């Protein structure tokens, strides 16, 4: 097998990514635009901003909070995911609980979601299954 040609192939930062540490259990990104990486275990990861790309890889995260507009997040397993805003896209390998407040958000989870709560319109959630769910608003698509 050939050696990786960039650090992004081995889970490290991509050429344009800024690495964010987890100080006192919290990794926070507050920005308008840019690409960021969290790669260490963290109790809480908070993204506040617009047009931000965030990768959360190789890390265990208890709570992932995304606030703002037009953000893109790719994460591994998260215990809880909260989306607040518009037109955000989140992809996760697993999420125990998902809360969406806002409009036009997309959440894709590879595993089943334990609990799902949506307040807003035109949100799309995809997962192979959902335990308990509460959906308020029009035009939402859920499993």
Label every model-predicted segment.
Residues 2-143:
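Extended beta-solenoid/beta-helix repeat architectures
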